[in-house]
């Protein structure tokens, strides 16, 4: 729907804002959940809040009106109805990049407590969301100018640096607690900028690889790679933590 209603000349910018809402939600969710948990709220109540958010999302989606689009005749069962074959290399790359994202959103709070960062770790996701919002200032327009791979490479470099610094916190905290805490939240900001410019650029890349009648398939491939990568990150992170 988003792809069909925006002009192609501003596709990168539009998909950037669309992706921003998804990424920020992935940051706000853990932050809100951690704040509730640290405040003594039961897990049952936390999941009730999650259910309420889902119901609001469903209500909002049901209010969206779109112009009629005639169906495209295809084979009843075919792989290209679900996966954009031309986008498989990009899908594998996105999957691998989503694995550390899944690990971070689920286990960074445990990591902070384990190394001795005594602060509200939920603010990590606040700064991450701020970083993602900052990324929208420039990345969408760069993508619209055709610099998709350059934007992805820049985001990747920022993410690599942020994970290196995150791993270094275990040593820095032995030297200075306050400096480590500041760095910890600075890492979240940097990581948010990195992921915030990469993921929408990937979405635009998938759409550009597909013909007009396969834009939905392109977005499906993008989201499948994203979801599978995050799932692998959660499982792998849990296995490593145990």
Protein language model regions, located:
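C-terminal membrane-cytosol helix-exit motif in multi-pass small-molecule transporters
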Residues: 52-70
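Helix-to-loop junctions at the C-terminal end of transmembrane segments
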Residues: 136-147
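Cytoplasmic helix-loop-helix junction between adjacent transmembrane helices
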Residues: 1-20
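Small-residue (Gly/Pro/Ala) motifs that create kinks and tight helix-helix packing interfaces
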Residues: 25-37, 233-241
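C-terminal transmembrane helical hairpin of 12-TM major facilitator-type secondary transporters
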Residues: 149-202
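Extracytoplasmic gate region of multi-pass secondary transporters
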Residues: 89-124
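Juxtamembrane intracellular "pre-TM" segments in multi-pass secondary transporters
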Residues: 66-93
